[in-house]
Regions:
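Amphipathic coiled-coil/heptad-repeat helices and related helical stalk/stem segments
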Residues: 15-18, 106-107, 136
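Structural beta-alpha unit
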Residues: 73, 79, 83-120
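A structural micro-motif
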Residues: 30, 93, 150-151
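Small/aliphatic-rich secondary-structure junction motif
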Residues: 2-64, 88
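Hydrophobic structural packing positions in well-ordered secondary structure
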Residues: 5, 22, 85, 110, ...
Length: 156
């Protein structure tokens, strides 16, 4: 039976390194999900209240244009990652792209997804230095603590 692998994915170089590592190391019969947590901007971008001030409306439009561009960049990065996996021998139908709006926080949302039947979680390491990482933490550290019963691979 093939493993279900969850790769926490954004458009960062670290996430791409995690994909490249999976492409090199894991058996090609795995089922891979590239999972992205995205800001829930629908409530802001779909807001068309007549009470909006002209200033807020102009700022809303600018914000929504930027958010749409970010989503396009993420989609392009997901397709690039899928291409890397396919080029390494995974079949197209073994790879799923999944994006969910942020509900409880990036790490909590990744952990919640991991608890839906995955055998392995793969994360890229952000690479904060020293004291900053100690105080701020990181998504990978939080996922480690929230999904302790799952195997987790953190790629630097």
């Amino acid at each position: 039976m093939s493993q279900k692998v969850l790769i926490a994915f954004d458009d960062s170089d670290n996430a791409l390194r995690a994909v490249e590592y999976v492409a090199k190391v894991l058996e090609k019969d795995c089922r891979i999900t590239l999972f992205s947590v995205v800001p829930d901007t629908a409530s802001i971008c779909d807001l068309h209240s007549p009470e909006l001030t002209p200033y807020f409306k102009s700022q809303q439009d600018s914000f929504c244009v930027l958010e749409k561009k970010k989503q396009e960049l993420l989609s392009a990065a997901q397709l690039k990652a899928k291409g890397i996996l396919v080029a390494s021998g995974f079949q197209q139908d073994q790879i799923r792209l999944k994006s969910e709006p942020k509900k409880k926080g990036i790490a909590r949302d990744i952990a919640a997804e991991a608890h839906t039947g995955y055998d392995l979680i793969v994360l890229g390491r952000r690479g904060l230095a020293g004291i900053k990482e100690l105080f701020m933490g990181s998504v990978s550290q939080k996922v480690l603590s929230l999904a302790q019963e799952k195997p987790i691979l953190i790629v630097s």
